[in-house]
A protein has these predicted regions:
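Jelly-roll (double-stranded beta-helix
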Residues: 1-304
Length: 304
C-alpha cells in the first residue's frame, strides 16, 4: 500500500457569491487540473442571516453537476423544470445540469440562525455535456453510515466504504464523497483508488495528515489559532490536496477530526469555463451564452 503524499495546502478564501452570500471557497475559478474532475468547492458556513439570506436567485448551468450537502439550516430550491423542494440538515442534492437548467437556491438558517453546508461542482465529460438534466435528492436518513471498531464514522454520500455504497449513483467520474469523523487520538488509514485525484477538506477538530515521507505531516488546528502556531498549522477551513497513492493516513488530535474526503477519476479534457457554464471549447461557451440571450437555452433541441 502506498500512502498519498500531501501535495498542497489551500486555505479557503472569503468569497462573495450569488446576491451577496458570504462563503469560503476552497478552490475554483482558476487552474483546476489538479482537482479534475472537480471544478469548485464552497463552504457556506455562517451564523449571521444577513450574510446568506439573499441567496442564489435564478441562474443558469450547463455542462456540470452541482452537489449540495447541508449540515445545518435548509436550502429551498426551484428550477426551470418545475421542481420545488428543500434540502435540510444531512440531506444531499446531486444536480446534473447537462444541456441546461435555470434554478435558484435560497438558504435559511436553523432555529439559532446557523447555516452550514458545502457545494461541490463536478465537470461532465464531453459525451454528457448535453445530457438531459436530472436530480438525485437524498434525505439524511437514506445516507449510510459506516461505523468502524475504533469509533470512526463515515457518512457515504457517493461511492463506497467498508462494504457499503452511498445513495448517489450513475455518475460519470466515479466519485467517492465521504464525510469522515475520527475520534480523539485515533490514527486512521482510508483507501483511495490509485488513479483518482483526491483531496480532504477539514471543517472540524484538529489532527495531522501524514505524508508518505515521514515524519513530515500537515497539522490542522481549530479555528482561531494564533500567530504563535508554526507555519505548517492551518485552521479547520483547510483543503489538503494529495498526490497519487492508494490510501490516506490521518491522526486525529485531542478534539477529534472531521473532514470531507473526495476523489474522482480525472476526465483529462479541455475546459472552457465562464461563470455557471462549463464546456470544452470557447466556441461552445459563446454559443451557450448566445442561447441565453436569445431565449433558446432550455430548448430540448439546443445544440453545443
Amino acid at each position: 500500500m502506498a500512502t498519498r503524499r500531501v501535495n498542497r495546502l489551500v486555505k479557503a478564501k472569503p468569497t462573495l457569491e450569488g446576491a451577496g452570500v458570504r462563503l469560503r471557497r476552497a478552490f475554483g475559478f482558476g487552474a483546476t487540473s489538479d482537482y479534475d474532475p472537480f471544478l469548485l468547492l464552497d463552504d457556506f458556513r455562517n451564523e449571521r442571516p444577513e450574510d446568506y439570506l439573499a441567496g442564489f436567485p435564478w441562474h443558469p448551468h450547463r455542462g456540470i453537476e452541482t452537489i449540495t450537502y447541508v449540515l445545518a439550516g435548509t436550502v429551498d430550491h426551484g428550477d426551470s423544470m418545475g421542481n420545488r423542494g428543500s434540502i435540510g440538515a444531512g440531506d444531499i442534492q446531486w444536480m446534473t445540469a447537462g444541456r441546461g437548467i435555470i434554478h435558484q437556491e435560497m438558504p435559511k438558517g436553523d432555529a439559532d440562525g446557523r447555516m452550514h453546508g458545502f457545494q461541490l461542482w463536478a465537470n461532465l465529460p464531453s459525451s454528457l455535456k448535453m445530457t438531459v438534466p436530472r436530480y438525485q435528492d437524498v434525505k439524511a436518513r437514506d445516507v449510510p453510515v459506516a461505523a468502524d471498531d475504533d469509533g470512526t464514522e463515515v457518512r457515504i454520500v457517493c461511492g463506497s466504504y467498508g462494504g457499503r455504497r452511498g445513495p448517489v449513483d450513475d455518475v460519470a467520474a466515479r466519485p467517492v464523497y465521504l464525510d469522515v469523523s475520527i475520534p480523539a487520538g485515533k490514527r486512521k488509514t482510508l483507501p483511495v483508488e490509485t488513479t483518482s485525484h483526491a483531496f480532504a477538506y477539514v471543517f472540524g477538530g484538529a489532527g495531522k495528515f501524514c505524508n508518505a515521507s515521514a515524519p513530515l505531516a500537515v497539522e490542522t488546528e481549530p479555528e482561531g489559532w494564533a500567530d504563535a502556531h508554526p507555519p505548517s498549522a492551518a485552521d479547520n477551513r483547510t483543503l489538503v490536496l494529495f498526490d497519487r497513492g492508494d490510501e490516506v493516513e490521518v491522526q486525529a488530535g485531542d478534539e477529534g477530526l472531521r473532514f470531507l474526503l473526495i476523489s474522482g477519476q480525472p476526465l483529462q479534457e479541455p475546459v472552457a469555463w465562464y461563470g455557471p457554464i462549463v464546456m470544452n471549447t470557447q466556441e461552445e461557451l459563446r454559443h451557450a451564452f448566445q442561447q441565453l440571450d436569445e431565449g433558446t437555452f432550455l430548448r430540448p433541441d439546443a445544440r453545443r
